[in-house]
A protein has these predicted regions:
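Short histidine-centered loop motifs in beta-beta connectors
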Residues: 186-209
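Active-site loop architecture of trypsin-fold serine endopeptidases
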Residues: 164-168, 215-227
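Beta-strand-enriched, solvent-exposed domains that form extended recognition/catalytic surfaces
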Residues: 17-96
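Short, acidic/hydrophobic/Gly-rich beta-strand patch recurrent on exposed beta strands
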Residues: 137-138, 177-183
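A structural signal for short beta-strand/turn segments enriched in small hydrophobics and glycine
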Residues: 147, 153-155, 203-215
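Acidic, glycine-rich catalytic/binding loops that coordinate metals and/or anionic ligands
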Residues: 106, 168, 199, 204-207, ...
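Surface-exposed, glycine-biased beta-strand/turn segments
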Residues: 64-174
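Bacterial Sec-dependent N-terminal signal peptides
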Residues: 1-22, 36
């Protein structure tokens, strides 16, 4: 199922009186300095948009760090006006994305010898539509089945505290998940995991085929399954991409077909 939290993994400032938690101010002499903090282990970038002129500025973070991103004369503007004037949003990845490895052969997200049915393939009529979820695949998996990393990488986000789910959009942010950054700058997400069903930690390096968690039915989900996709970062957030899965292009994983990890 579609899981939108990755488009912006921090909500941008939408109300004039609100300030994102990763933005801070420092008053020094005659200036106001705006700082942004990258709170995750992987690469991120800050997008700053002038609400009036629509001009954009991008700041890249290569590690957990705090950087000065703007400076103003305090006689001309105050902190409230800064938040009113600019929209801040923080995204995974880099603002200038290099070409990814289109020929990489990803592994199936389950153990060797296992066989699962495709519940929903790419670009389908239910939830795998639009740039974010077009190339996602759902495998029908009972609760508690082993989920494996489809590629080696760095774990940058985990969630496993939810025990609820359903069809309604109100459950969208209740999905347990794992996000892994790959060496070529792409990302994979594994969604709808069971409560306390994550076996890896943020900052941990995982190998291809390693068991990283257990399938479930949390979040916006109508039945137990594993939703996963591969993404590239863009200046407007994550975009799902086609890829090769167990030597087969993702477009050939159709609803009702089975995949076996030999």
């Amino acid at each position: 199922m579609k899981y939108l939290i990755l488009i912006l993994f921090f909500v941008s400032c939408s109300k004039a009186q609100e300030k994102p938690s990763y933005i801070s101010f420092k008053l020094e002499n005659d200036s106001i300095y705006v700082f942004a903090k990258n709170p995750v282990l992987g690469k991120t970038f800050l997008k700053i948009v002038d609400r009036k002129t629509k001009t954009e500025k991008f700041i890249d973070f290569n590690k957990p760090e705090t950087l000065k991103v703007l400076q103003f004369e305090k006689t001309k503007i105050d902190t409230l006006e800064i938040v009113e004037k600019y929209q801040f949003s923080l995204h995974y990845g880099t603002s200038v994305f290099k070409e990814y490895d289109t020929l990489y052969n990803y592994g199936l997200p389950f153990l060797k010898g296992k066989r699962y049915k495709v519940l929903q393939g790419q670009n389908s009529n239910f939830t795998h539509k639009g740039d974010f979820s077009r190339y996602a695949i759902d495998f029908k998996m009972n609760v508690g089945q082993e989920v494996c990393a489809i590629r080696e990488g760095l774990v940058i986000k985990v969630k496993e505290d939810s025990n609820i789910g359903g069809r309604d959009k109100k459950y969208r942010d209740k999905a347990n998940l794992i996000i892994i950054a790959h060496p070529d700058g792409t990302f994979a997400q594994y969604v709808h995991l069971k409560k306390d069903g994550v076996l890896v930690n943020k900052g941990q390096t995982v190998k291809k085929g390693q068991v990283i968690g257990y399938s479930g039915n949390t979040g916006m989900s109508t039945e137990p399954h594993l939703h996963f996709a591969v993404y590239k970062p863009t200046k407007n957030g994550f975009v799902s991409i086609p890829y090769i899965l167990d030597s087969i292009p993702t477009k050939r994983y159709k609803k009702g077909k089975f995949a076996r990890n030999k």
